[in-house]
């Protein structure tokens, strides 16, 4: 598989442990508040809770050129489509909570491909997880902007998953539109009232509830607000 330089390192620009079973309507923002924040010393209880956090995701990447340590980290949904079998590894995540979300992903789960840190951020398409978490090779590559000299091959810190393009959204769903629904839903109790995209906006890997995922998909059929 080719190894394009890409991805946000776990946190992004300002565009931005659970017990028992989660119900489909449990809010991802509320769930996140119960998960330890960016701490490498996760307890086994917290790790087990993360596994039940979500089965839908939002994953951010930068569609416009930006040099990081001399390397262009641009990677858009069009770049994903151009990969062999429209599949690639989602590398470069360097935030513990985002990494733990990667480790919680299961084969076949769907994720929104979100264009971030660009002129018009928003949801561009859908992809699916085709390989569960395994060590991120870029942490060991000295010339890679995501190289981590503190990570050892016999005990790697960072993980990645493989993703495959599913389809483009029927229309691009911009951040501004999602934000307008989020603000309205905070008052009415609607599906996006605590969407992590707004409550923890700097996180590059974000869980979605079933309700949030379904609502965002429904926006494809509506005229832009």
From Swiss-Prot:
It is found in: Nucleus. A motif (Nuclear localization signal) lies at residues 5-10. It comes from the Eukaryota. GO terms for cellular component: nucleus. InterPro entries: 5hmC_binding (IPR052181), EVE_domain (IPR002740), PUA-like_sf (IPR015947), THYN1-like_EVE (IPR047197). Phosphorylated. Residues 1-47 are annotated as: Disordered. PANTHER family: THYMOCYTE NUCLEAR PROTEIN 1. The keyword DNA-binding does not apply. Residues 23-39 have a biased composition (Basic and acidic residues). Specifically binds 5-hydroxymethylcytosine (5hmC), suggesting that it acts as a specific reader of 5hmC. This is Thymocyte nuclear protein 1. Keywords: Nucleus, Phosphoprotein. Pfam families: EVE. Transmembrane segments: none annotated.
């Amino acid at each position: 598989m080719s190894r394009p330089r890409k991805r946000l390192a776990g946190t992004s620009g300002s565009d931005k442990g659970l017990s028992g079973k989660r119900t489909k309507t449990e809010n991802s923002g509320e769930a996140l508040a119960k998960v330890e924040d960016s701490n490498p010393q996760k307890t086994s209880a917290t790790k087990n809770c993360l596994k039940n956090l979500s089965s839908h995701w939002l994953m951010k990447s930068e569609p416009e050129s930006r040099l990081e340590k001399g390397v262009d980290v641009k990677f858009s949904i069009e770049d994903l489509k151009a990969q062999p079998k429209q599949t690639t590894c989602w590398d470069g995540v360097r935030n513990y909570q985002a990494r733990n979300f990667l480790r919680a992903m299961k084969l076949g789960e769907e994720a929104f491909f979100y264009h971030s840190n660009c002129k018009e951020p928003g949801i561009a398409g859908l992809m699916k997880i085709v390989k569960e978490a395994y060590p991120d090779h870029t942490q060991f590559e000295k010339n890679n902007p995501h190289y981590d000299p503190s990570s050892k091959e016999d005990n790697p810190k960072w993980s990645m998953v493989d993703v495959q393009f599913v389809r483009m959204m029927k229309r691009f769903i911009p951040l501004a539109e999602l934000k307008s629904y989020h603000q309205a839903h905070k008052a009415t109790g609607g599906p996006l009232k605590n969407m992590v995209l707004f409550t923890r906006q700097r996180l590059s890997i974000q869980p979605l509830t079933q309700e949030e995922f379904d609502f965002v998909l429904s926006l494809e059929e509506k005229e832009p607000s």
